[in-house]
From Swiss-Prot:
Every GS beta-grasp domain range: 35-125
Superkingdom, taxonomy of origin: Eukaryota
Gene Ontology MF: a single term: glutamine synthetase activity
Gene: GLN2
Protein name from the UniProt record: Glutamine synthetase, chloroplastic
One GO CC term on file: chloroplast
Domain GS catalytic: 132-380
Biological classification of the source: Eukaryota, Viridiplantae, Chlorophyta, core chlorophytes, Chlorophyceae
Amino acid sequence: MAFALRGVTAKASGRTAGARSSGRTLTVRVQAYGMAAEYIWADGNEGKPEKGMIFNEMRSKTKCFEAPLGLDASEYPDWSFDGSSTGQAEGNNSDCILRPVRVVTDPIRGAPHVLVMCEVFAPDGKPHSTNTRAKLREIIDDKVTAEDCWYGFEQEYTMLAKTSGHIYGWPAGGFPAPQGPFYCGVGAESAFGRPLAEAHMEACMKAGLVISGINAEVMPGQWEYQIGPVGPLALGDEVMLSRWLLHRLGEDFGIVSTFNPKPVRTGDWNGTGAHTNFSTKGMRVPGGMKVIEEAVEKLSKTHIEHITQYGIGNEARLTGKHETCDINTFKHGVADRGSSIRIPLPVMLKGYGYLEDRRPAANVDPYTVARLLIKTVLKG
């Protein structure tokens, strides 16, 4: 590669060498860099007014390396960023530390480039207050590990036109046909934004994320993808990486994706959630229904603790309508999508399996969901 600026030319040619001057042109031989690593983290602005209805908490920046590294996070150095610009520090002491914890292939740039999920640490070396992954790590002891918790995360999102902020595919200044034909819909009259949803699914697969599927949702312009089944730390990492990919691909499509729990508050329209399927080893074996019932009883006693951490703005979604239970009520049932905790019918018929927590909003922190379920079910 060659760089020229104001009569200065630099040519990449193997190892770094000296500079050679010839007239007004300075030629510098430099090492060609061979890999880009996108360091990704969650900021401290989620839910703040300046974010509006977008609820996008993802940040990232690129670090280049001379030679490709592997997929082991320990190979990647810590890095820093300006926390005063992300809601994570004051200007007079603004440096925060990024520590790599998960590395996957970058499906956009392609191999050997990578995406690097990071935890955020304060200058004193302690986990930052926004580092919810660290809080999850702390609760995973030998007992939790032995229970081999599995999670399946149903991430809903709503597409918005970049220029207008209007829901993608909706008529300008108006509403589409009533809900009904759009859930798992097919055809230009029913499915809005499929190219982005498909591109996102493909990117997640290429990155090696455990994405289980996608579907158009009840409200037009609303989609869902599923991550899992995976363990607790993998759940948080993969949901956050998948969210970053969704936002990044949206740049190319001119579509903004929002995790706002209730993007349309006028009319008969569904909200946007993140139903979380959860099981322990004891739930997944014959006779596990008893363990599931015990877990539901524990969850009924910690409803307020969960609901206050299940996403900002969730009260607008959990109204008792549109396949939700009222936010102030705890209810469970078999095949009941108006419940707080749903037991799928096949689980009841088999007598073992998993439960579905239908309370989390689309903008919920996945590390927090994983931690609270462990805390209540296994440590309560």
